[in-house]
Design a protein with these regions (language model features):
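Acidic-glycine-rich active-site phosphate/pyrophosphate-binding loop
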Residues: 9-11, 150, 228-244, 283-286, ...
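Glycine-rich cofactor/substrate-binding loops
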Residues: 2-31, 74-79, 297-417
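Glycine-rich anion/phosphate-binding loop at the beta-strand->alpha-helix junction
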Residues: 180, 184, 244-338, 342
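Short amphipathic alpha-helical segments with heptad-repeat character
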Residues: 123-134, 141, 167, 171-174, ...
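Generic, well-ordered alpha-helical scaffold segments in large soluble proteins
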Residues: 38-42, 88, 92, 139, ...
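A helix-coil-helix interface module used to build multimeric assemblies
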Residues: 2-204, 210-230, 239, 291-294, ...
């Protein structure tokens, strides 16, 4: 069985190769290993574990050394992939010297590794998202400039409203994507933080240095907090203000940010679908031979990119609500809500990046029919400017009376005066 995201046929439509690599078993495991290597380095610097142990732990924290078949079997048995990875590291280091590998994973817990790996995966994902936002903004700026004086009819409740320019329509979208860029930059320092705090979030196993060849405090800070800082530095992450094992608001914020972002893409795609209708004919998706073709109606040019965008964005919004549900976790380690994230977060990221790539493609190659816009603007034979007539007459006969004159069908005559 395959899903639409990892399908050989649909995979590059509903995901991207870059995202598939980030959320793969191999990359997740690599980040587990990066955590263990970074932890060993930090603890050796502080005298918590022997330098020899740290050197060999780091040496064997290579994804190429992991037996993924054994990892799969052990994960099915244990329920989590972290302990099987740690067991493999310990076993390899113990071949160097008996018991030397037992220093691996010192003071850490399963969720420390899992959460930190997710943060690193999100960091990679949002780097790609940021690139897509920048490309979309650049394309929109070009459309705004090119069509700033191209008149068209605005639509209110799907009816012609008043004249606007197509450049103005694009400028509103540009403002939205610029706000999304700001949101992303504001999100990063809250999201890109380490999780390393031990079983219940207190760093209790290394809170006191009495059993280590290390001082109780380093640089005026408790040993556990200093270890946390060094590990964060190794991984290029921020230091958490406090443990967040069952405080999942930052991850939910990331998911809901992607929901907002892709919803803006879907707003544009919805407008484009309507503008591509045969009876409207104001804009079209980029032309590529056979793209959007019908199997039975050769004249059709379907808005296939817009359809993909709307479908993916709707799915992201639905799954983002599941990430909000995962916030409701019990005590200091949840029984169930945590696993929700494992299910939906990779899909949210895959669909979001694919959605943005489709959006970028549409903006960069958008076909605008200026004559079609002008033609539609003239359909009402001047009625589209009735608001301006009403406001002009309002100075003399009153705005409400002028409105009622137009409402009951006399604006056509007034426009001819």
């Amino acid at each position: 069985m395959t899903t639409i995201i990892d399908s050989h046929i649909f995979g590059n439509v509903f995901s991207t190769p870059e995202i598939a690599a980030i959320w793969s078993d191999k990359q997740r495991t690599k980040y587990f290993l990066d955590f263990e290597a970074g932890l060993a380095k930090a603890q050796a610097k502080l005298g918590i574990i022997p330098q020899k142990a740290a050197d060999h732990i780091v040496k064997h924290c290579r994804v190429e050394e992991i037996d993924f078949n054994d990892l799969r079997r052990q994960t099915e048995l244990i329920g989590y992939p972290v302990l099987p990875v740690v067991k493999q590291i310990v076993a390899k280091v113990n071949t160097v010297e008996a018991q030397l590998g037992e220093w691996a994973h010192w003071g850490a817990t399963t969720q420390d590794l899992t959460d930190t790996a997710v943060v690193l995966q999100l960091r990679d994902t949002l780097a790609l998202v940021g690139q897509s936002i920048d490309a979309i903004i650049n394309a929109l700026r070009g459309l705004c400039e090119r069509y700033k004086t191209t008149p068209m009819a605005a639509r209110s409740n799907l009816q012609q409203a008043v004249p606007i320019s197509f450049g103005f329509k694009m400028a509103r979208l540009l403002a939205s994507f610029e706000r999304h860029k700001q949101r992303l930059n504001e999100l990063k320092p809250r999201l890109f933080v380490l999780e390393f705090s031990g079983a219940a979030g207190t760093l209790a196993t290394i809170a006191s240095a009495s059993s280590y060849n290390a001082p109780d405090e380093v640089d005026g800070k408790p040993l556990g907090l200093r270890c946390q800082e060094l590990l964060a530095e190794e991984l290029g992450l921020g230091v958490p203000t406090i443990a967040w094992h069952t405080e999942r608001d930052n991850l939910a914020e990331a998911a809901n940010f992607l929901a907002l972002l892709t919803a803006t893409s879907a707003k544009f795609a919805t407008d484009l679908k309507l503008m591509m209708q045969s009876e409207v004919g104001e804009a079209r998706e980029p032309y590529v031979a056979h793209r959007g073709s019908s199997s039975t109606m050769p004249q059709k040019r379907n808005p296939i990119g817009s359809a993909y965008i709307c479908g993916m964005a709707a799915s992201v919004r639905g799954m983002a609500s599941s990430m909000t549900e995962a916030i409701v976790a019990d005590h200091e380690r949840s029984t169930g809500p945590w696993q929700i994230e494992w299910i939906v977060l990779p899909q949210i990221c895959a669909l979001s990046h694919a959605c943005l790539k489709q959006t970028q493609y549409l903006f960069e190659g958008l076909e605008v029919d200026e004559k079609g816009m002008q033609r539609n603007l003239e359909l009402s034979k001047g009625m589209v400017v009735s608001e301006a007539v009403m406001m002009g007459l309002g100075k003399t006969i009153g705005r409400q009376f002028a409105h009622d004159v137009g409402k009951y069908g006399h604006t056509y005559l007034l426009c001819r005066l």
